[in-house]
């Protein structure tokens, strides 16, 4: 089995599972940002979020939501950071959502890269129009 997350799902790769059901498997990240950093993966191999069938999105993200609540309740975290990469910066080509426990003054910035305003309102309007066109039925 080439996909390490498929191997975790299959039980052939060891992992500290925290959730395992018919939709998803959630397990501790081996290199966590903080203790309790969890990866949530769909049971079926899907490389990215856009590869997840629409009917599976809701059930999958209900599991992500449960894990986010668990890091707060079970670990006493003040909140969580929830994120997924699609292709760029995606270390394993199997959809995975990071749920990272957060606390005030934990040293992690909300975004890990510089943020910049649009140079002109017209630039923002053009980007918004391109996205609306891509979202049109």
Where are these regions (language model features)?
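HIT superfamily nucleotide-processing domains
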Residues: 1-137
